[in-house]
Regions:
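Long, contiguous internal "core" modules enriched in hydrophobic/ aromatic residues
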Residues: 1-172
């Protein structure tokens, strides 16, 4: 993940920025007690699956955007297959890299709204792609400018048990 060759070729500046963020995250946490320190001291490097726990949602969104399309589609396919398996749904869920980018964008927007005490209702998410997910879930009465868009993506991406808990707490 620190090798520029593993990312898109059309935006070298953006890719270098992402690699810089990853490197800085490792640097900032290498002295602290935790997984990064352990992996650096005991293994000489930090696996990506450890590093992502130290990244912000925005960092993850931009990192995903810097990946090659083939890698993005592998990730999207993984989540589609996981959803179909957990919900025992034989209908094929076709989500692609654009859907995943939209999910990460809306999660970042919602997180920032919450962190800065902004309202979530009637928020404008007009540039978020959701029709593919809504059609699959057979939801016809939705508006791209509502928080329900984030909830639709959570249903697809979260483990079923986590989503059920989230949904029940939301309704409480």
């Amino acid at each position: 993940y620190l090798d520029i060759a593993n990312y898109r070729e059309d935006d070298p500046k953006g890719v270098l920025k992402q690699i810089s963020i990853l490197t800085k995250t490792i640097h900032d946490n290498v002295g602290a007690k935790g997984a990064i320190k352990h992996y650096i001291e005991d293994h000489g490097s930090v696996p990506l699956w450890v590093l992502v726990n130290y990244l912000t949602i925005g960092n993850l969104s931009y990192l995903y955007g810097a990946l090659k399309d083939s890698e993005k589609n592998i990730i999207a396919k993984y989540y589609a297959e996981k959803y179909m398996k957990q919900y025992k749904n034989s209908k094929i869920l076709r989500i692609n890299s654009k859907d995943m980018e939209s999910a990460l964008k809306i999660f970042n927007l919602v997180r920032n709204q919450c962190a800065h005490d902004e309202r979530l209702y009637n928020s404008d998410y007009k540039n978020i792609r959701v029709s593919n997910i809504a059609n699959y879930l057979e939801i016809t009465n939705y508006n791209n400018r509502r928080i329900v868009v984030a909830i639709l993506y959570l249903k697809i991406l979260l483990n079923k048990d986590y989503y059920k808990k989230f949904h029940s707490e939301l309704n409480a």
